[in-house]
């Protein structure tokens, strides 16, 4: 079996994985004032925040190119790849996952699977890494898919944002529109649910209480097993430091990965968002 893993630019990957020849990534465009940008090509993350601050309109995103994925699958076939696993931004907040399922019929020479990751960022990157590791350990394609599904089912993320407008106006928050007029008195905690949708999980009165509640939720989640934890933020280093300190003060003794949301996810969450991702160790 020669396996390729395809993901998108919302997945947080360490440098060694970005350079791995078996991993391929599709860029997701960010549109600001009718100009199209691709992070890492013609847009740095600092440029993104500056352009977002300067614009009177909220930025938008589009889906990766279907034709680019179709062409990539053809290229992989010509290079002798026999199997492909595609892991992309959660189907609950992007239509891309639903739109690509037909491609398996277009390339019958490759055995492929596009499971819904139901997540993004660091947890998505963890899935990509694990799939590659399992393949190189000699696991069969079906065994990899079974283990991957277990990881998907036990992975989640909880989020606190400064401004719900980005999520609601972008159509990425399933049950948040009723909160828009009430943000002065509450600080909602959001989560990725079982369908990969971002939903309101709890309403907390202040940011400090919400941060403490995030730690309580995390400790409850990891009580029944071994998990990798990541703190993820969009230009909110002070909040990330505070959340890490609260975690350590609560008795959490494991390594905590800290990463930044890329431009695509920051488009939907806005500046100042803080989150933690939880992924099982399998």
UniProtKB/Swiss-Prot annotation:
Gene3D superfamilies: 3.30.1180.10, 3.40.50.10170. It comes from the Bacteria. It comes from Streptococcus pyogenes serotype M6 (strain ATCC BAA-946 / MGAS10394). Hexadecanoate binds at residues 61, 94. May bind long-chain fatty acids, such as palmitate, and may play a role in lipid transport or fatty acid metabolism. Residues 3-280 form the DegV domain. This is DegV domain-containing protein M6_Spy0690. SUPFAM superfamilies: DAK1/DegV-like (SSF82549). Keywords: Lipid-binding. InterPro entries: DegV, DegV_C, DegV_domain_contain. The lineage of its organism: Bacteria, Bacillati, Bacillota, Bacilli, Lactobacillales.
């Amino acid at each position: 079996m020669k396996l390729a893993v395809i993901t998108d630019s919302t997945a947080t990957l360490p440098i060694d994985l970005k350079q791995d020849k078996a991993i391929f990534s599709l860029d997701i465009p960010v549109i600001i004032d009718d100009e199209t940008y691709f992070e890492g090509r013609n847009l740095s993350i600092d440029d993104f925040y500056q352009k977002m601050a300067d614009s009177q309109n909220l930025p938008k995103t589009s889906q990766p190119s279907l034709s680019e994925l179709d062409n990539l699958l053809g290229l992989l076939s010509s290079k002798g790849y026999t199997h492909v696993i595609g892991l992309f931004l959660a189907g609950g907040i992007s239509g891309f996952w639903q739109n690509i399922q037909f491609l398996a019929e277009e390339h019958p020479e490759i055995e492929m699977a596009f499971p819904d990751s139901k997540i993004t960022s660091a947890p998505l990157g963890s899935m990509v890494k694990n799939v590659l590791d399992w393949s190189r350990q000699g696991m069969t394609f079906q065994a990899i898919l079974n283990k991957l599904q277990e990881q998907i089912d036990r992975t989640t993320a909880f989020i606190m944002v400064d401004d719900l407008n980005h999520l609601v106006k972008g159509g990425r928050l399933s049950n948040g529109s009723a909160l828009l007029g009430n943000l002065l008195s509450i600080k909602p905690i959001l989560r990725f649910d079982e369908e990969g949708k971002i939903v309101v999980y709890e309403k907390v009165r202040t940011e400090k209480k919400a941060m403490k509640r995030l730690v309580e939720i995390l400790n409850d989640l990891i009580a029944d097993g071994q998990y990798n934890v990541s703190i993820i933020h969009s230009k909110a280093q002070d909040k990330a430091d505070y959340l890490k300190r609260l975690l350590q003060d609560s008795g959490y003794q494991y390594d905590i990965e800290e990463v930044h949301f890329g431009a695509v996810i920051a488009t939907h969450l806005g500046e100042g968002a803080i989150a933690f991702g939880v992924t099982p160790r399998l």
